[in-house]
Amino acid sequence: MKYDNLLDRFIKYVKVNTRSDPDSETTPSTESQEAFALTILKPEMEAIGLQDVHYNPVNGYLIGTLPANNPTLTRKIGFIAHMDTADFNADNVNPQIIDNYQGGDITLGSSNYKLDPKAFPNLNNYIGQTLITTDGTTLLGADDKSGIAEIMTAIEFLTSQPQIEHCDIKVAFGPDEEIGVGADKFEVADFEVDFAYTMDGGPLGELQYETFSAAALEVTFLGRNVHPGTAKDQMINALQLAIDFHEKLPAKERPEYTDGYQGFYHLTGLTGTVEEARASYIIRDFEEASFEARKVKVENIAQSMNAQLGTKRVLVELNDQYYNMKKVIEKDMTAIELAKEVMEELTIKPVIEPIRGGTDGSKISFMGIPTPNIFAGGENMHGRFEFVSLQTMERAVDVIIGLVCKA
């Protein structure tokens, strides 16, 4: 009974295209996210017994409350998941359900793609389980619709079993996490909890309270275009300036060469002509000092190139995006200790590792609500090879229920 609607709920959610748009200036960045909140999630939240369900058109958050049914459970706990999906095709998501996976390749629909354990050895962790995959033409959207489905399923179970005592619970579904702005307008006053959890992690047992600190870097290169036949000592090729700039960054400090606590510079876009070029980067690191040092390094490279060119032709624009939430959460580890205790009681081994990324919890933690991250089940996220285990999603439901009953 506890999990009866989990799979159907998840399938229903992922079939709705809620891809966010980094170029949009609206909140949410796409109309489909608001429609998803208002036409699908809000009625369902009300139907399963959440109270004071309301949508804030200013920040795109849909919030509901389940009051405590035991006055001695005085903590207030929140659960957060994001509605948008990543920058990959999300039109006509057509999930495949693989019952009792027995190993080997999984053909993704009628496409030429397959999930191969040689390329994706994480498949070997799911022998005997029910896997939900893509058909090879889209992402799946388990990031983070598995989190939404898990929260909904846990609430539905609690309201159907009033004899199960629980604390005050707040639920929030928000927009635009994948483009890094989802929590920018989050209203703490509308989410009065002692701490919260984003249900936005990956495999079973993930419990995370360290994220990258993150910055966006835009570098504009100003060239001088003349006819290539008479270009000697006159032409300044903006594209070549971009190449020179990139080559001055440490070659081994890129995502493809780093892991664990190592930071990186990541070139995400390069456009331009001889006259003008633009390079987009993201900068990531865990430690505050090394994060700041990376930003200083790119400024110094630009200054050095401009000095050599004799004029300002390399223009740097740096914007911090979010910070490592460890700085906030380690001041009071209650949320982590509670989650560890609940997982261990459920015979789930907590896997406490840094997130090589960020969550909405990064920003929300700095707003005053410690918000670590818990597994939601997704694997190979953000692309056609994404999949999720139904059994892992069920365990996430168990963790949510355990947290609110133990609070």
UniProtKB/Swiss-Prot annotation:
UniProt entry tagged with the keyword Phosphoprotein: no
Binding sites annotated in the UniProt record for Zn(2+) 2: D143, E178, H382
Keyword vocabulary terms for this entry: Aminopeptidase, Cytoplasm, Hydrolase, Metal-binding, Metalloprotease, Protease, Zinc
Gene3D superfamilies from the UniProt entry: 3.30.70.360, Zn peptidases
Residue ranges of the TM segments: none
Enzyme class of the recorded protein, top EC level: hydrolase
SUPFAM superfamilies tied to this protein: Bacterial exopeptidase dimerisation domain, Zn-dependent exopeptidases
GO biological process: peptide catabolic process; proteolysis
InterPro entries to which the protein is assigned, alphabetical: ArgE/DapE_CS, Bact_exopeptidase_dim_dom, Peptidase_M20, Peptidase_M20_dimer, Peptidase_M20B
GO molecular function: metallopeptidase activity; tripeptide aminopeptidase activity; zinc ion binding
EC number: 3.4.11.4
Highest taxon of the lineage: Bacteria
Localization: Cytoplasm
Signal peptide start and end residues: none
GO CC terms in record: cytosol
Cofactor(s) recorded in Swiss-Prot or TrEMBL: Zn(2+)
Catalytic activity: Release of the N-terminal residue from a tripeptide
Residues the entry annotates as binding Zn(2+) 1: H82, D143, D200
Co-factor remark: Binds 2 Zn(2+) ions per subunit.
Database matches in Pfam families: M20_dimer, Peptidase_M20
Active site residues of this protein: D84, E177 (proton acceptor)
Functional summary from the UniProt entry: Cleaves the N-terminal amino acid of tripeptides.
HAMAP family tied to this protein: Aminopeptidase_M20
Protein known as: Peptidase T
